[in-house]
């Protein structure tokens, strides 16, 4: 295992900058927010640790990239920021997300509620679900895993055409595996920062995807018209478990982070680290490191305390899609289907530690 450990000064500069204007901006944050973010360059911090690499196939090793500090993020001329007229994140589901209509509807509510808390202060809206056929995307059977895949680039074009006027971004979610080009095996997600659209698949997050008995395998793609999407009818959908929900929330917020202009994090263990495979994605935490949190706060303008409180409410309210909704209201809405949040409990404990630092 390799540990990527930066000096205190390097992390401090990455977080605050040496630009007097940005230093002054940082000093205007309240004392609690500065105290939490300063944990970035405290060697003994138990809240934020270094990045660990476990194999040569990990993202940083196999995809060398220049790191992005706060000043580079702030100065990026191509970075998009929500405006008063474009403060909505739209979610578009493609194909079924659950084995029943109720499960599918509840799952997307859970994801919507999580996004509302994670990108606190922005509106999160749902577009009407569509079958794969409506997108007119290319598709194939993966030669290695023998499962159906849809072309990510084609989906991005579809989402761009559907983007509402008040949208900051539109994100597509699907339980069907994605591929970005013929030479690639798969991709978890893909986003276009310029167009403000992204597509993310949760197909590989089911517990059985890599097993010999995976039910989504297709023996052979029949030589039919490229416009015949009937192969997707009743296609296999994994069970919505707590681990699958956690993995879905990670991917969704990571990719939306890219649309805000956050590049892959190379400073500390962080949600915005790249991931090349499922084991690495599981290692990646749900939280943003202080440097990436500073970037997102700059873009959205939230109170860090209120954002963390909203995330705790989402975890505590095991049946609601809305942070802070009453149990009675949500109980009525979802037909008693509990939100599987067991996998989030450890993160809740971490957030509570952060709130203690913020509210000293």
From Swiss-Prot:
The keyword Zinc applies. Its cofactor is Zn(2+). The active site is at residue 255. Gene3D superfamilies: Collagenase (Catalytic Domain). Transmembrane segments: none annotated. The keyword Zinc applies. One of its GO terms (molecular function) is metallopeptidase activity. InterPro entries: Archaemetzincin (IPR052009), MetalloPept_cat_dom_sf (IPR024079), Pept_M54_archaemetzincn (IPR012962). Keywords: Hydrolase, Metal-binding, Metalloprotease, Protease, Zinc. Its EC number is 3.4.-.-. Binds 2 Zn(2+) ions per subunit. One is catalytic, whereas the other seems to have a structural role. Zn(2+) 1 binds at residues 254, 258, 264. Down-regulated in testis from patients with maturation arrest (MA) or Sertoli cell-only syndrome (SCOS). It comes from the Eukaryota. It holds the Pfam family Peptidase_M54. CDD domains: Peptidase_M54. Zn(2+) 2 binds at residues 265, 270, 289, 292. One of its GO terms (biological process) is proteolysis. Probable zinc metalloprotease. Belongs to the peptidase M54 family. This is Archaemetzincin-2.
């Amino acid at each position: 295992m390799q540990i990527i450990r930066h000096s205190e000064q390097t992390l401090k500069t990455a977080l605050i900058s040496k630009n007097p204007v940005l230093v002054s901006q940082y000093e205007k944050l309240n004392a609690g927010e500065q105290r939490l973010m300063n944990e970035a360059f405290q060697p003994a911090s138990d809240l934020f640790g270094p990045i660990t690499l476990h194999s040569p196939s990990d993202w940083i090793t196999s995809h060398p990239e220049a790191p992005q500090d706060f000043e580079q993020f702030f100065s990026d001329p191509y970075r998009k920021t929500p405006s008063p007229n474009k403060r909505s994140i739209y979610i578009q589901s493609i194909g079924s997300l659950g084995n029943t209509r109720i499960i599918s509807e509840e799952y997307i509510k859970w994801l919507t509620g999580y996004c509302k808390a994670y990108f606190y202060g922005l509106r999160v809206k749902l577009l009407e679900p569509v079958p794969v056929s409506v997108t007119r995307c290319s598709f194939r059977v993966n030669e290695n895993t023998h499962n159906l895949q849809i072309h990510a680039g084609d989906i991005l074009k579809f989402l761009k055409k559907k983007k509402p006027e008040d949208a900051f971004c539109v994100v597509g979610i699907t339980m069907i595996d994605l591929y970005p080009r013929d030479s690639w095996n798969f991709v978890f997600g893909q986003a276009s920062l310029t167009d403000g659209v992204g597509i993310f698949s949760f197909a590989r997050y089911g517990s059985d995807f890599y097993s010999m008995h995976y039910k989504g395998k297709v023996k052979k793609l029949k030589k039919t018209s490229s416009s015949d999407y009937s192969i997707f009818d009743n296609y296999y959908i994994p069970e919505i478990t707590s681990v699958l929900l956690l993995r879905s929330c990670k991917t969704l917020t990571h990719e939306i982070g890219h649309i805000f202009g956050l590049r892959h994090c190379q400073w500390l263990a962080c949600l915005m680290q790249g991931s090349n495979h499922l084991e690495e994605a599981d290692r990646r935490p749900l939280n943003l490191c202080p440097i990436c949190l500073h970037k997102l706060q700059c873009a959205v303008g939230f109170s860090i305390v209120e954002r963390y409180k909203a995330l705790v409410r989402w975890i505590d309210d095991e049946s609601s899609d809305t942070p802070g909704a009453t149990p009675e209201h949500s109980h009525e809405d979802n037909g008693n289907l509990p939100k599987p949040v067991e996998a989030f409990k450890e993160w809740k404990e971490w957030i509570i530690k952060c709130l203690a630092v913020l509210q000293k």
